[in-house]
Design a protein with these regions (language model features):
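N-terminal export/assembly segments and adjacent metallocofactor-ligating motifs
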Residues: 2-195, 222, 230
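Intrinsically disordered or highly flexible coil/loop and linker segments, enriched in small
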Residues: 55-59, 87, 192-196, 220-224, ...
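Conserved short loop/turn motifs at secondary-structure junctions
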Residues: 61-70, 225-229, 253-260, 292-293
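An alpha-helix initiation/capping motif
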Residues: 68, 72-73, 205, 209, ...
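Generic alpha-helical structural context detector
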Residues: 80, 184, 188, 239, ...
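Short linear loop/turn motifs
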Residues: 92-95, 205, 238-241, 287-290
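P-loop NTPase catalytic nucleotide-binding module
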Residues: 177, 181-247
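A glycine-rich, hydrophobic/aromatic-adjacent loop/helix-cap motif
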Residues: 241-330
Length: 330
């Protein structure tokens, strides 16, 4: 998603593909011989090849891969209708999977494609491994600019003096691979200096005593040995976060697959947010709301699951009478 800076290059690249291309009949893969085709011809060509493969090898011989907004139809619905259980989103395992699993464990729901951060009302933002302005979505960069305009203080944890670091009031050049140690030390300070949101934690969380016991020895002095960030700086940032709670936030980034401990690292990051009491509050994480829509008369779907492992729509697969979805399903 490095479109923030590269989009202009892609738009005007002389080699940008603007129309469908089909390999010239008789040429071999690797020769680079293609001809321009219309969209209708290209789609018909793909459909014809898919039908030929299914006829010869069966529907399972085709795998479907998708990514991003709108891929539901391509990764979920189409494979089920086609009859292939082979569908996946491989990019997720390289990007957001750790944060989605961590969020499910900590918050009880995934983060989702667009990070639900209330940038506009945040007053203290800590970016850890978050290369905003370099490899994030344009809309997120716009939100970040709005936060700066509204006077938010920014801390950037990054071995490089990044684009975001140039906008920060603190830059913490951490030793690569030690982010979890820093997060654990922040948790230690928030708890043992009695800086966390006690009412919020008591009302909305479980397991606090276990977390407190777990981080007992993860002091800033311990973290300094691993991160090469001075213990006093670690303490100061934790205290500044606490002073701005609940409008202090550590946004979970994309591209989370780093060192193998990624899910646990993101869990530690989310624990800091919980201790700041910012989940579901202005300046922190907002909870996306879905409006309730009255029942609409739709014709039954006759399509049954087409193959083992597929969960295609079914004529008998419908919500019970009177069912109302939760407003916060997001």
């Amino acid at each position: 998603t490095a479109v923030a800076q590269a989009s202009i290059l892609g738009l005007y690249d002389p080699d940008r593909l603007k129309r469908p291309l089909i390999r010239v009949e008789g040429s071999q893969r690797g020769e680079g011989k293609y001809r321009v085709a219309t969209w209708e011809e290209a789609l018909d060509h793909i459909a014809k090849k898919m039908l030929e493969i299914r006829e010869k090898y069966g529907p399972e011989a085709i795998a479907f891969f998708g990514h991003g907004t709108g891929d539901y139809w391509f990764v979920d619905f189409l494979p089920a209708a086609w009859g292939s259980p082979n569908a996946a989103k491989p990019s997720v395992s390289l990007c957001t999977a750790p944060r989605e699993v961590a969020s499910q464990w900590v918050f009880g729901r995934p983060i989702g494609g667009h990070e639900p951060i209330d940038w506009e009302n945040a007053r203290y933002i800590v970016l850890i491994g978050h290369h905003i302005g370099e490899d994030t979505h344009n809309t997120q960069l716009q939100d970040f600019a709005l936060a700066l305009k509204n006077g938010a203080k920014v801390v950037v944890v990054d071995p490089r003096f990044s684009t975001a670091a140039a906008k920060a009031h603190r830059w913490l050049p951490i030793k690569p691979g030690t982010d979890t140690a820093l997060l654990l030390a922040w948790i230690h300070v928030l708890i043992y200096e009695d800086l966390y949101d006690k009412e919020y934690v008591a009302k909305y969380t479980v397991g606090f005593e276990e977390l407190k016991a777990h981080v007992k020895d993860f002091t800033p002095e311990w973290a300094e040995k691993h991160t090469e960030i001075p213990a006093q700086v670690i303490r100061e940032v934790a205290r500044e976060m606490a002073a701005h709670k609940p409008r202090a936030v550590l946004p979970p980034t994309r591209h989370n697959v780093w060192y193998g401990d990624d899910t646990y690292r993101v869990m530690a990051l989310l624990y800091v947010n919980v201790l700041l009491g910012n989940y579901g509050r202005p300046g922190g994480f907002y909870i996306a709301q879905s409006p309730y829509l009255e029942k609409y008369p739709l014709p039954p779907l006759p399509l049954e699951p087409a193959a083992g492992g597929c969960s295609g729509p079914s004529g008998g697969d419908h919500e019970p009478e009177g069912f109302k979805p939760r407003a916060d399903k997001g």
